[in-house]
């Protein structure tokens, strides 16, 4: 007997039979041990055959083990442990199994051959008796085996991989639609009709759905499955099966060369045998190119081509545009066998309709309500702010995550109840400490504490019962909704089966009753102040968007009008003496937000011109804080680093083949991470002229393509470029009242035009001239800087006061029109912060004191109160 002629599963069963014999303490392996091993085999064929015959494999195995337990067991010293022998009877069974395999023209002895021989054991044996008890016979097994195996012969050591290949390596989408496992498909009628038209063709009847990730390619195929189920398809497609092929399952575990091809051929043979009744769906179609390819082996695409060419295989593919170009178009023979169907991103209106159709599924799954305004908000916010993903996928994700957020809040302790629990624990610890004390004050405190604890416990009990009541109410609503969904599914099934009496009974009796129950359950419990939130509202959607994109949620929900009307005031608080600049920036932002400027361009683009230290960069920081709540949302690029021609590549990333290609560009990566920011190009005149060619498409279209081909969205950024061009004209051409003399602006603009090309300057919204600061404005800046110092000293409760004389003295001493306000910070550091630090360390200045700063003998003096 050649053990090499037994399949892998047969060999595993023989090894397991030996283990069973050892476990029972038997001295030889008999037919019953092998039968037990076959019936208990994981993913084995015998349990599947028993299931098909209506017998439970577990019951059969238990009956065998009961009888095996009655046999005499041998223990103690003697033969080497585990050394047992094959009985003469089992040997005969295996020889008969070999003969039976030859009779069926199979090359290997498989588990079904052994099982059929075991069932023919005489009634005097345990095996024969149990087989008759369970009404099992060789003929019955062969009848079921024919359904599973078909006309296939055992020609390899792993024949089970090729049995029922479609069930094993695919999902029947029509069957899943029948069971209600697929989500409803709303819209996409044009694409589904196009797929149906292609499937109805005589040749090249294989559509491939091509579109960006998340636009709903798989949903179109699920929509087709729904239509096939309802019979809403042409005659040629009615009663068709639609199987989604799982390439991962096909490849997984294929250890030896040829094993993958064998599995795929088994799938294709089943499809071929169906004579066009089965349509195969391959998601991620590009995976078939190169799948299973090893030295000398064929990949999946080459196995599919002949059947696709002959029209024996009806196949629907789905893949993205990039992968179609990269894999399918490279193989023209494969490409011409498929007919492309382009799937575009749905419009905002269509995406809202899709989400409305899915709303009920999400409500039932999460057990919460989803308001219609939340659906509209999810689509509009995702379209506006999540630019690197596609509708409807990104909007569905928003709704799903917001509903999950509400559900987790329902399942966890409410904040009020959690706070009450913590207070009770804190007071109980305090009570235990006070019980050890004997003085009168401690006794009084203990008495007060007991009363407080009693009140808190009463509050906790009330809150707990309210929470449980509300949670029970929400769960009750959820169970009613689940019943409604099951009833609707049952109505659809009854209508498909033309069981009109049952359909009418369910529709006009059971469904109406459930809807009445739902209405009364949703009405109840709304009068009291609720602990739990059970509805997804627009603010929940905004909160999720804020988490994903980093935009503060308060800013997102605050009305645009309020935010923009306050913008000029907020900027004036921190930027002193630059009314024209502040007004120009705030007005440009107002125009952009009011929709009077092109929405495809950035919020605003400005060139700030002026001498050093007049507030150009400070205005950028203030603008970032006012619009985006934080100074951190500023992308700052020092243009003196981009003086060489090749440095331009650093903005958008190195081209393919160059070092640093994978790292991305400094500008594009920064804006991709923070799409809502102020982009500051500092000292812009120092950059190479080619940099401005890159900026042209940002200023005009609000977008920039990086070296990887990804489009970065600049529509929600404010572009600011600072420069010192024309500073000498501005310093010399200022009047005593702080206004520019006539002709100064023209000279500065002329200088600017000499530096930059007209097509660049023409795209900038506003060129703003910053005036040199006057002494009066310097005094205000002194107050601003001292305000920041007060903030640092506030932690120690130290206050600092500055008289008018001292303020004017500092302004006069530190002011230099050439350097602007920057010398002020240095002056305050040397003449106020350093002396105060000395006094703090020496112990002269203590917490809670006030420092008066005055001028004595042309120097600052400090008086501590």
From Swiss-Prot:
Chief localization: cytoplasm
Annotated stretches, region: Repeat 2: 86-151
Residues involved in ATP 2 binding: 610-617
InterPro entries cross-referenced by the UniProt entry: AAA+_ATPase (IPR003593), ATPase_AAA_core (IPR003959), Chaperonin_ClpB (IPR017730), Clp_ATPase_C (IPR019489), Clp_N_dom_sf (IPR036628), Clp_R_dom (IPR004176), ClpA/B (IPR001270), ClpA/B_CS1 (IPR018368)
Binding, ATP 1: 211-218
Coiled coil (residue ranges): 396-530
CDD domains hit by this protein: AAA (cd00009), RecA-like_ClpB_Hsp104-like (cd19499)
Name of the protein in its database record: Chaperone protein ClpB
Organism classification: Bacteria, Pseudomonadati, Thermodesulfobacteriota, Desulfovibrionia, Desulfovibrionales
Name of encoding gene: clpB
């Amino acid at each position: 007997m050649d053990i090499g002629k037994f399949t892998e599963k047969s060999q595993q069963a023989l090894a397991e039979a030996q283990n069973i014999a050892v476990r029972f303490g038997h001295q030889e392996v008999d037919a019953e041990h092998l039968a037990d091993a076959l019936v208990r085999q994981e993913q084995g064929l015998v349990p599947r055959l028993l299931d098909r015959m209506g017998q439970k494999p577990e019951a059969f195995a238990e009956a065998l083990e009961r009888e095996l337990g009655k046999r005499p067991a041998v223990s103690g010293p003697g033969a080497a442990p585990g050394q047992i022998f094959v009985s003469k009877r089992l040997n005969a069974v295996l020889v008969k199994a070999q003969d039976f395999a030859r009779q069926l023209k199979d090359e290997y002895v498989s588990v079904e051959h052994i099982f059929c021989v075991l069932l023919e054991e005489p009634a005097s044996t345990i095996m024969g008796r149990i087989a008759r008890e369970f009404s099992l016979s060789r003929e019955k097994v062969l009848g079921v085996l024919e359904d599973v195996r078909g006309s296939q012969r055992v020609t390899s050591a792993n024949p089970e991989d090729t049995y029922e290949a479609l069930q094993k390596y695919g999902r029947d989408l029509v069957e899943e639609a029948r069971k209600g496992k697929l989500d409803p498909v709303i819209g996409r009628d044009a694409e589904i009709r196009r797929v149906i038209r292609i499937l109805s063709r005589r040749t090249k009847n294989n559509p491939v759905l091509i579109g960006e990730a998340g636009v709903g390619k798989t949903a179109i195929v699920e929509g087709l499955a729904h239509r096939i189920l309802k019979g809403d398809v042409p005659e040629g497609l009615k009663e068709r099966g639609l199987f989604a092929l799982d390439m991962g399952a096909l490849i997984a575990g294929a250890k030896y060369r040829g094993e993958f091809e064998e599995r795929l051929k088994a799938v294709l043979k089943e499809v071929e045998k169906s004579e066009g009744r089965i349509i195969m769906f391959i998601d991620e179609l590009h995976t078939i190119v190169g799948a299973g390819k090893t030295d000398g082996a064929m990949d999946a695409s080459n196995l599919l081509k002949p059947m696709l060419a002959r029209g024996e295989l009806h196949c629907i593919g789905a893949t993205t545009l990039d992968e179609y170009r990269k894999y399918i178009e490279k193989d023209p023979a494969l490409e011409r066998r498929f007919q492309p169907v382009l799937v575009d991103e749905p419009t905002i209106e269509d995406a809202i309709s899709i989400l409305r159709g899915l709303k009920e599924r999400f409500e039932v799954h999460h057990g919460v309500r989803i308001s219609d305004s939340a659906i509209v908000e999810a689509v509009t916010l995702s379209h506006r702010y999540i630019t690197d993903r596609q509708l409807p996928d990104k909007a569905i994700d928003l709704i799903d995550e917001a509903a999950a957020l509400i559900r987790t809040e329902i399942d966890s302790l409410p904040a009020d109840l959690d706070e009450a629990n913590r207070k009770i624990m804190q007071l109980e610890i305090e009570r235990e400490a006070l019980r050890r004390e004997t003085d009168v004050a401690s006794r009084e405190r203990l008495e007060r504490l007991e009363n407080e604890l009693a009140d808190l416990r009463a509050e906790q009990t009330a809150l707990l019962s309210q929470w449980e009541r509300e949670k029970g109410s929400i769960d009750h609503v959820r169970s009613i909704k689940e019943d409604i969904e099951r009833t609707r599914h049952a109505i659809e099934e009854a209508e498909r089966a033309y069981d009109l009496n049952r359909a009418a009974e369910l529709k006009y009796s059971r469904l109406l009753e459930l809807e009445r129950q739902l209405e009364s359950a949703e009405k109840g419990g709304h009068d009291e102040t609720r602990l739990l939130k059970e509805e997804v509202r627009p603010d929940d959607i905004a909160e999720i968007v804020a988490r994903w994109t980093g935009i503060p949620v308060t800013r997102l929900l605050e009305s645009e009008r309020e935010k923009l009307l306050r913008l000029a005031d907020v900027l004036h608080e921190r930027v002193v003496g630059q009314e024209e600049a502040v007004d120009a920036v705030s007005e440009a932002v107002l125009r952009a937000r009011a929709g009077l400027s092109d929405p495809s361009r950035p919020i605003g683009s400005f060139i700030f011109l002026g001498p050093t230290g007049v507030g150009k960069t400070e205005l950028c920081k203030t603008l970032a804080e006012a619009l985006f709540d934080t100074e951190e949302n500023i992308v700052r690029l020092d243009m003196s680093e981009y003086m060489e021609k090749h440095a331009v590549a650093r903005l958008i990333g190195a081209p393919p083949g160059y070092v640093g290609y994978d790292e991305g560009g400094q500008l594009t990566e920064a804006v991709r991470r923070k799409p809502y920011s102020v982009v500051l190009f500092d000292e812009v005149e120092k950059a190479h002229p080619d940099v401005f060619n890159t900026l042209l498409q940002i200023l005009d279209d609000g977008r920039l393509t990086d070296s990887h081909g990804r489009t970065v969205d600049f529509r929600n950024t404010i572009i600011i470029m600072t420069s010192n061009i024309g500073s000498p004209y501005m310093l010399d051409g200022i009047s005593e009242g702080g206004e520019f003399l006539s002709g100064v602006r023209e000279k500065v603009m002329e200088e600017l035009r000499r530096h930059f090309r007209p097509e660049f300057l023409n795209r900038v919204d506003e060129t703003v001239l910053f005036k040199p600061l006057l002494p009066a404005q310097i005094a205000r800046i002194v107050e601003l800087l001292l305000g920041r110092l007060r903030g640092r000293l506030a932690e120690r409760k130290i206050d600092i006061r500055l008289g008018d004389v001292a303020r004017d003295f500092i302004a006069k001493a530190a002011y230099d029109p050439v350097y602007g306000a920057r010398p002020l910070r240095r002056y305050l550091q040397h003449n106020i912060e350093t002396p105060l630090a000395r006094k703090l360390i020496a112990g002269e200045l203590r917490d809670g004191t006030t420092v008066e700063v005055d001028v004595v003998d042309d120097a600052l003096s400090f008086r501590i109160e």
